[in-house]
């Protein structure tokens, strides 16, 4: 995939629609976080992934970390990264 720069530091990309399955509570937290940052869910996910690809934490500021903690509590997301390879579909 090629990309081209277009004025004022913008990066033109080719986005595709996808049907990715995501755990329900994780999705609710992500949607809430996207709303908090006034961005789309897709833009939020792209930013998280680009940070992860470089071994960087996508959220370091206390305000975002507090919002994430609050959203996790509100939506009952009671597990973290340690569970990432143990998630299985419910019946």
Language-model segments: residues:
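Short amphipathic alpha-helix starts
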Residues: 14-30
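Short, positively charged interaction helices/loops
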Residues: 54-91
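Short, basic amphipathic alpha-helical segments that act as recognition/interaction helices
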Residues: 37-65
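Arg/Lys-rich, low-complexity, intrinsically disordered N-terminal tails that contact nucleic acids
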Residues: 1-12
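Short hydrophobic alpha-helical segments that form membrane-spanning helices or hydrophobic packing faces
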Residues: 30-31, 45
């Amino acid at each position: 995939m090629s990309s081209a720069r277009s004025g004022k530091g913008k990066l033109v990309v080719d986005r595709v629609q996808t049907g990715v399955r995501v755990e329900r509570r994780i999705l609710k937290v992500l949607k809430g976080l996207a709303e908090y940052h006034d961005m789309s869910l897709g833009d939020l996910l792209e930013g998280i992934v680009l940070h992860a690809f470089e071994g960087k934490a996508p959220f370091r500021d206390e305000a975002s970390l507090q919002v994430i903690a609050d959203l996790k509590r509100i939506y009952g997301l009671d597990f973290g990264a340690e569970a990432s390879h143990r998630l299985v579909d419910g019946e």
